[in-house]
């Protein structure tokens, strides 16, 4: 019985409570809901997002009229009218305001700090506006990123453009200079061709060792002598041979092109003399000078030639720097001569060091290995790997490879490693031992 009575009492209380809540006005019901939400989030950091279902149509009518302040809760309200495009943002309420609403239970609207309104002709939502601004800034940054070309690139383009415009005039100037000095250019080309032919032919004869041709060597000597005498005789009025013995040629004025002409002729003549001396060494028979020792003489002759060739232009450059005109500044000429002498002294010291090393190598005997026994020659196949013939005076290196003495000496005049295993065999000067002559043009 008592359970039945309690059940009836509970049903009556439930019906009464439901009737009371149904009769509450909408404004009070809404205020109680906001009060309960504020009491849950006392910090006010995370406000609930509520969309007003019963808001009047005038809420999204634009900015033509004044908006009522009591129609927005202290939260973020996003909405759009039928036309689309009206957006309102309300900043979150502070802690004090949230607490006040929780205590009082009534809702007090706070004036929004930021109010963004986009008309229907501009867009549909705030997110599109923010995204568009972000894309706009990124596009502007992307446009500025490539920027203008680097200064070096722009300068290079300017130089190329200038060359394109000035190239015809440069070619005209070069053509004029070549026509003015056509005789000197032709003589220099002819002497350079003669030197290249004689140098390559001599190296070929040196590589033949005892099989060299004496007739070819005599032809080289005659060819070089004929070219030298022809040039000196043709320009005998200038007395170009005086520069070979450090005397002044017969020229009224010495300009830059005359200086190059005299220095060039003297340098080619000295090269011809160097090749002629090497031809005499090649022509010597084996009884007088062994093949393995000829490379040392080639080296000494070349070093002495380069030293003498570097000394010949000195007096010519002194004369050109000081000049014959008395109006020239002696102070400037003296300074330039001192600078030239300093630079030239370093070059001469290097040449003297090369001559000293070559003479030291000439006076010392060079042993590339020891005599090989018959058993070692048999193990090596009785055939030299260089000349592909039977061993003659075989030598065995530290790497246990056997070669002919002459073949090995000729090989090590060009290289410093074993022909088979490429291990280092010697560590001495090997330049110019093959009979070659330097093609360097000694201008200064």
Curated annotation (Swiss-Prot):
Which Gene Ontology BP terms does the record give?
positive regulation of ERAD pathway
Q: Which UniProt keywords apply?
A: Membrane, Metal-binding, Transmembrane, Transmembrane helix, Ubl conjugation pathway, Zinc, Zinc-finger
**Which residue stretches are annotated zinc finger (RING-type)?**
384-422
Q: What is the protein's membrane topology class?
A: Multi-pass membrane protein
Report biased composition (Basic and acidic residues) as residue ranges: 131-140
Q: Which residues cross the membrane?
A: 182-202, 215-235, 256-276, 330-350
MF (Gene Ontology) = ubiquitin protein ligase activity; zinc ion binding
- Pfam families recorded: zf-RING_2
From the Swiss-Prot or TrEMBL record, state where the protein is found. Answer: Membrane
Q: Could you tell me which residues belong to the region Disordered?
A: 13-41, 92-149
Q: Which Gene3D superfamilies match?
A: Zinc/RING finger domain, C3HC4 (zinc finger) (3.30.40.10)
Q: Where along the chain is composition biased (Basic residues)?
A: 107-121
Please give the InterPro entries that the UniProt record associates with this protein.
Answer: RNFT1/2, Znf_RING, Znf_RING/FYVE/PHD, Znf_RING_CS
Which residue spans belong to the Extracellular compartment? 1-181, 236-255, 351-444
Physiological role: E3 ubiquitin-protein ligase that negatively regulates IL3-dependent cellular responses through IL3RA ubiquitination and degradation by the proteasome, having an anti-inflammatory effect.
* Name of the protein in its database record: E3 ubiquitin-protein ligase RNFT2
Say which species the protein is native to.
Homo sapiens
């Amino acid at each position: 019985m008592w359970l039945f009575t309690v059940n009836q009492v509970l049903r009556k209380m439930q019906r009464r409570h439901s009737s009371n809540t149904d009769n509450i006005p909408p404004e009070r019901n809404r205020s109680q809901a906001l009060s309960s939400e504020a009491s849950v989030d006392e910090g006010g950091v995370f406000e609930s997002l509520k969309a007003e279902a019963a808001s009047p149509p005038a809420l999204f009518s634009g900015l033509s009229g004044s908006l009522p302040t009591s129609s927005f809760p202290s939260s973020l309200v996003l909405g759009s009218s039928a036309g689309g495009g009206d957006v309102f943002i309300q900043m979150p309420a502070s802690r004090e305001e949230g607490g006040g609403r929780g205590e009082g239970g009534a809702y007090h609207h706070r004036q929004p700090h930021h109010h963004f309104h986009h008309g229907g002709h501009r867009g549909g939502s705030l997110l599109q506006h923010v995204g568009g601004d972000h894309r706009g800034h990124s596009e502007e940054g992307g446009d500025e990123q490539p920027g203008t070309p680097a200064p070096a690139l722009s300068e290079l383009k300017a130089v190329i453009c200038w060359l394109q415009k000035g190239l015809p005039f440069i070619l005209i100037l070069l053509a004029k200079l070549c026509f003015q000095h056509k005789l000197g250019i032709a003589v220099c080309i002819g002497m350079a061709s003669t030197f290249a032919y004689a140098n390559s032919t001599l190296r070929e004869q040196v590589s033949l060792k005892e099989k060299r041709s004496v007739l070819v060597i005599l032809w080289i000597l005659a060819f070089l002598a004929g070219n030298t005498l022809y040039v000196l005789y043709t320009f005998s009025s200038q007395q170009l041979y005086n520069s070979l013995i450090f005397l002044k040629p017969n020229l009224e004025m010495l300009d830059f092109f005359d200086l190059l002409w005299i220095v060039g002729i003297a340098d080619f003549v000295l090269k011809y003399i160097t090749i002629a001396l090497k031809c005499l060494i090649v022509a010597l028979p084996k009884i007088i000078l062994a093949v393995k020792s000829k490379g040392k003489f080639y080296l000494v002759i070349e070093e002495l030639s380069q030293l003498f060739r570097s000394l010949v232009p000195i007096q010519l450059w002194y004369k050109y720097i000081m000049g014959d005109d008395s109006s020239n500044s002696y102070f400037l000429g003296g300074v330039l001569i001192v600078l030239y002498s300093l630079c030239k002294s370093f070059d001469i010291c290097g040449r003297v060091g090369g001559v000293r090393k070559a003479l030291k190598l000439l006076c010392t005997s060079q042993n590339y290995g020891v005599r090989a026994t018959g058993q070692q020659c048999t193990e090596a196949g009785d055939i030299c790997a260089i000349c592909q013939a039977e061993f003659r005076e075989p030598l065995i290196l530290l790497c246990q490879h056997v070669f002919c003495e002459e073949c090995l000496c000729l090989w090590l005049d060009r290289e410093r490693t074993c022909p088979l295993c490429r291990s280092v065999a010697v560590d001495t000067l090997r330049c110019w031992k093959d009979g070659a002559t330097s093609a360097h043009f000694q201008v200064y």
